[in-house]
Amino acid sequence: MLTALQADLASVVEGVNLVWVLTVTFLIFFMHAGFAMLEAGQVRAKNVANQLTKNLLTWSIGVIVFFLLGAAVSAIVAGLTGGPATTVADAFMGLYAPDASATTAWVDWLFGAVFAMTAATIVSGAVAGRARLRAYLTYTILIAGVIYPVVVGVTWAGGFLNGLGFHDFAGGMIVHGMGGIAGLTAAWIIGPRMNRFNADGSANVIPGHSITFAVLGTLILAFGWYGFNVGTAAAPLAYSDGGVTLGSFAYVGRVALVTTLGMAAGALGAGGVAFYKTGKVDTLYVANGVLAGLVGITAIADDIVWPGALVVGLLAGAQLPIVFEFVEKRLRIDDVCAVFPVHGSAGVLGTLLYPVFAVPVWHEGASIVSLAVPQVVGVGVIAVWTFVATTAIFGGFRAIGQVRVSADHERQGLDTAEHGVDTYPEFGSPDADTGIRADGSGIPYGHGFMTTQEDE
């Protein structure tokens, strides 16, 4: 039986843990400001308001859907695939009207919701400049209500991949990998922007309007990532036998360290490969390399040490220019904000490298094969589910001619055509003869990723 002092101490521990979870949750929420700036900087000036509107509505619609439907779907799917058994009624009412004893129910939901909205908003960058808003928002409803919750159900919520031993600490594959694959699939179905590719299949670069915004967005995202990774250590204190010990905080320093080193190595990897290929250090490659390094670390940050973080971050950054060029020149898919090489392939890479750098392999003698098999199966299941679901939704809209805006609206710009606003009104209207504005929104097409060209 707990004494009064012990009971008070237990309450203090729970309170500290809840404050920690809420703090990192708010930090992760602020990552949406980073996504908004990163994507706005990489689109043309005539499409900035459209991109910002999609970011705002992704959160606003998605978080309501995740509350009303998505969280319950996760619990139901988990119960159907080997996780904790639950009824449909309990899955919904456990969130709508939790028991008095379930003091953390809504905090736990909010923590899960910011992860869900991160997965949802990744897609918007891939389809920028031509996606019809109603198609995109319908997909937002379904990714928040069904697609992402199914992935969570078979993994974090206790489903069959969790039972198999699949390891994803903070969403390298569950959040970022699936978001990147969904974005690539959507961009493939919608098709490229006008004049993105020539008749012979060669690519034209349509430069974004503000590297400044893109870099600012990168740094905001990197800051929020500390909430994403470090915050997943969700119970800093533990109470047992009348005493308080460090819970997840026993390893939180290592998570913070490998997160920091991973992002830095990612920037160097992407910048180095870009320099090797073009003779120039592309600013956007460096910025996106920071994010690719972070994505690569996210699935395994709890179970690796600093040498592994440097290698994984470097590889995640280095693959970015290579994969982007493959998507652009071989697949001829117009992934505007490079969401697949930043989130998709980097997330897959980091998740699959877990058995190579995992602490249990080197310190506990675990078998690499025993750790590798669940990772391969998990990546495959998540990738196939995401591809099939995304194809069905955007393919359906394409079949009825509602997946992308009209050619006139795309040419005019979605800010004025779809929203009735001009993001930069002080620059005036495009010149009737050249189509070039003072803000550069009609700038002739260049070469390379965004700014550079390989030497002849």
Curated annotation (Swiss-Prot):
Taxonomy, superkingdom: Archaea
Subcellular location: Cell membrane
GO (cellular component) term, any one: plasma membrane
UniProt keyword Transferase present: no
Induction conditions: Expressed during ammonium starvation under nitrate-rich conditions.
Site (Twin-His motif. Important for optimum substrate conductance): H176, H343
GO molecular function: ammonium channel activity
Membrane-spanning ranges: 18-38, 61-81, 109-129, 141-161, 170-190, 211-231, 255-275, 281-301, 304-324, 339-359, 377-397
InterPro entries: Ammonium/urea_transptr, Ammonium_transpt_CS, NH4_transpt_AmtB-like_dom
Topology in membrane: Multi-pass membrane protein
Keywords, ordered alphabetically: Ammonia transport, Cell membrane, Membrane, Transmembrane, Transmembrane helix, Transport
BP GO annotations: ammonium homeostasis
Subunit: Homotrimer. Interacts with both GlnK1 and GlnK2 after ammonium shock.
Membership in a protein family: Belongs to the ammonia transporter channel (TC 1.A.11.2) family.
Chain's role: Involved in the uptake of ammonium/ammonia (NH(4)(+)/NH(3)). Transport is electrogenic.
Protein name as catalogued: Ammonium transporter Amt2
Organism field: Haloferax mediterranei (strain ATCC 33500 / DSM 1411 / JCM 8866 / NBRC 14739 / NCIMB 2177 / R-4) (Halobacterium mediterranei)
